[in-house]
């Protein structure tokens, strides 16, 4: 613990804290738990939630809750977390427990978990660390697969990207959503005194110090922190899910908290402090899985599959019997009080006596910032081949590249069909889940980020990110109702990193406000930075966002492009090549100006595309982002197993070079496939441009009389779908 913090605590207490109390402060005042560096910045998101009548529970609880159907009072619970450091040290258990923790956040609101997403970042899979990267990929995917499949929650989508900035700090961000009726919601606030505190699950030494471990840079000695990584048990988690929801159905449970970072210390203090009450605990009643555990170890253990319940006095036996039926360890460990203090005894010895406001309100840090915008004017003379004559091989190379190729190697290992609600499966721009309780409504989910854009221009890259996510939702006709953010950055004590954090948050907040989607929760993960031989290796700024949207009628989502369809694009392509996959993969550079997003135009485009989809006028829709028009139209062909003929002569009003026309990642573009009879109506509504037709079994692109692309769809699919296995060193 910082000596200034310790001095402040001593002054406030009027005494020196004991070792147990110091351990509690060290964990709760860690960056991971307290957001000391970012709490002031996160207040910028407040403007996005004002006067939104559908937000039932906003930021601050284990999960946000948004009403999605007035007739049934149905609400969607949504939460997002990271498990970055643990997943680098122990990829299997780090990723598995990341899934377990986010699912418990959802059941903490008495919501049934219905879907998972994951956003993964790894190092350069073709670089010097490729063997380590492959090992990490396998471990993380195995952990997510085994845990998610065994608890019966479908993993319906996400993203996976590679960059050398993640060589020493991979990222594992997980999203979970659930459903609950408004009248059945339970929160994490114990607002009454004399409630009985019941702990579900046994406590061991695994994960001790996990919160403080996640709040510092990794070093070459970090392998020694393996004991800080929690160990998960998916079968126990399944029992915890079912039993907790059953206990809540009694209406005797007044508040719940998952035991995550900092264990009992965090869950109990947050549960009581947020409700304005105190807590009195008896540690001898905590069921232990390891002998001889000290009070400190019990208070900060991060053993998995544990829940803390505050229940009505007199209902203890009824609640305990429910958990015993599932053969879960369960015991009464304390009660809520009117003292607003955290009082803990162990075998009649007082081991903790602290004011909750001091424990739960860490002093905030004021970090210095230094402007760090790396984008430069686009100097095409520095590129070896300013205008390549042959584009077929370039398109194939992009389709095979790590950040564009099919991730079926990953998602086909996940059970995305369990619960039988998945309508649009992984591999598309957005995942779609049917709502049996509110048919014909449906939910759509996305998770997105473009770290390269955010490195070059933190503010502009974050604006672009919001727009891309909303366009992805528009492809299935979904209206965005709530946004989560997972802010992954390097060391905030370094001015360049803090500037990136600040500008990315500004960009996300401004983008969300203009588009009209409230930011209802999220997570901050800092210190994703490694020091080796005195040199810093920070990750690229990676503000991953996940947006949930509602679809009014699931029957109108696009069913797929078909022969004879007309292809329409919603916006022009511009000379904006900075940070594009084309520049990175073909020319090994990230220079240039990143694409600029016009938020008002984007809002109009997504609104009109949503309306057209909901009116049943769109057969297929594909967002143009990574890889530009060339990759987007390729995905349309491969997904629908159809050919396309494009003529971009009339569309190329900016007179762009051929490679820029195909691979620029200009914002605002969605490719639509529509019936011939509806084409004029759609073009007029969107002020879009007709660029071609669905025809044959090849992708043919020309510019007036100049043929740019001519490729068989089967050849494209072979490259696109097999590339990931090849990257992992598997023989095809």
From Swiss-Prot:
- Whether Cytoplasm counts among this entry's keywords is yes
Catalysis performed (reactions): N(2)-formyl-N(1)-(5-phospho-beta-D-ribosyl)glycinamide + L-glutamine + ATP + H2O = 2-formamido-N(1)-(5-O-phospho-beta-D-ribosyl)acetamidine + L-glutamate + ADP + phosphate + H(+)
Residue numbers binding Mg(2+) 1:
81, 523
Spell out the GO cellular component terms annotated for this protein, sorted alphabetically and separated by semicolons: cytoplasm
Query: Under which pathway is this protein filed?
Result: Purine metabolism; IMP biosynthesis via de novo pathway; 5-amino-1-(5-phospho-D-ribosyl)imidazole from N(2)-formyl-N(1)-(5-phospho-D-ribosyl)glycinamide: step 1/2
Family membership, please give it: Belongs to the FGAMS family.
- Annotated function: Part of the phosphoribosylformylglycinamidine synthase complex involved in the purines biosynthetic pathway. Catalyzes the ATP-dependent conversion of formylglycinamide ribonucleotide (FGAR) and glutamine to yield formylglycinamidine ribonucleotide (FGAM) and glutamate. The FGAM synthase complex is composed of three subunits. PurQ produces an ammonia molecule by converting glutamine to glutamate. PurL transfers the ammonia molecule to FGAR to form FGAM in an ATP-dependent manner.
Name of the protein described by the UniProt record: Phosphoribosylformylglycinamidine synthase subunit PurL
Which species is listed as the source? Methanococcus aeolicus (strain ATCC BAA-1280 / DSM 17508 / OCM 812 / Nankai-3)
